[in-house]
UniProtKB/Swiss-Prot annotation:
GO terms for cellular component: extracellular region. This is Potassium channel toxin alpha-KTx 8.3. GO terms for molecular function: chloride channel regulator activity; ion channel inhibitor activity; toxin activity. InterPro entries: Scorpion_toxin-like_sf, Toxin_alpha-KTx_8/9. Belongs to the short scorpion toxin superfamily. Potassium channel inhibitor family. Alpha-KTx 08 subfamily.
Length: 29
């Protein structure tokens, strides 16, 4: 998942979107 789509991608998992080296990382809230 790209950084651009990260917020939407993570919100479905109720997680926080973070960008690491242009990769999407979801952090549990």
């Amino acid at each position: 998942v790209s950084c651009e789509d990260c917020p939407d991608h993570c919100s479905t998992q109720k997680a926080r979107a973070k960008c690491d080296n242009d990769k999407c990382v979801c952090e549990p809230i």
